[in-house]
């Protein structure tokens, strides 16, 4: 190891920065996977994770096993039994520019045929069927062990208790639990009327709902499910094995078994197809049945998937392109407060109506009084507005140059 002043100083700075942001990333991951209120925005979280990985790439000494940049999810929460997955669940490699997506497609993927899918903004789960019967439903957890939420999974009408047709002896079906966008406002209104916690976005609502201690309470939540992958598969017939040769064939099997799959998926076989899919669903994202935060591409050949394998965190045969949030400017007309049944005061902005992420908004949350002070917004300001998770309008801050 080189011990000159510059390298030592750089490593010291890197370690100091790592120590500053790693705990924040860990806390954000725990909140994300537990359904608690987010402590940072998705975009801020993505930036922190990218910075953490960059620090660890430049200084491998920082890439310890406990680093949140090396993790897949979060440990199982207290209050639920742990359950081991038969095969590990991985995260996905994220890219944030079309150039990086093209590099993956033409490089790693070798411009192979891929499935193109939207990235559902939900809670990842693993469903284990034994003899065609739902035996275990678990959250992703850390990828090796998750939370046993079988009783709550059984309350989701779109999750079949029994598979149909020609199914394997054992199969793990991976997918996302979500609350449909059309159901979210009504769900939050019922929460508000009952004096219960409202959720910032559908994903948090889904995560919180799936972790209800009482399955009857979970059954009252408008949860839905879509499958997007498989883990362990044992005892499949030759006909099933033939279809398992491709990702497309896997999805066809899911449909034959009575398992819901995404209506927003298709095969792509050129860069133009890939880019076209990204742009198409960037325009349609507010019109889908569920929230999305990106587009996912998977090499269609499962033999090629096997050959490429995975890192300790992500498969090399798949990638997720993350969409940036839509941000618009409008005039802040007033700041008002809403007092909840528990006495909690929530300030909100009254604005000149503006269209953002597919709908017209005239009010936006300011979260709490300290956030108003931190953002420094004043009545009469031109402010930047976006929808958190593409659902909840929020004011990011003023356009100070226009004051």
What are these regions (language model features)?
Residues 2-403:
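RNA/tRNA-interacting regions in translation and RNA-turnover enzymes
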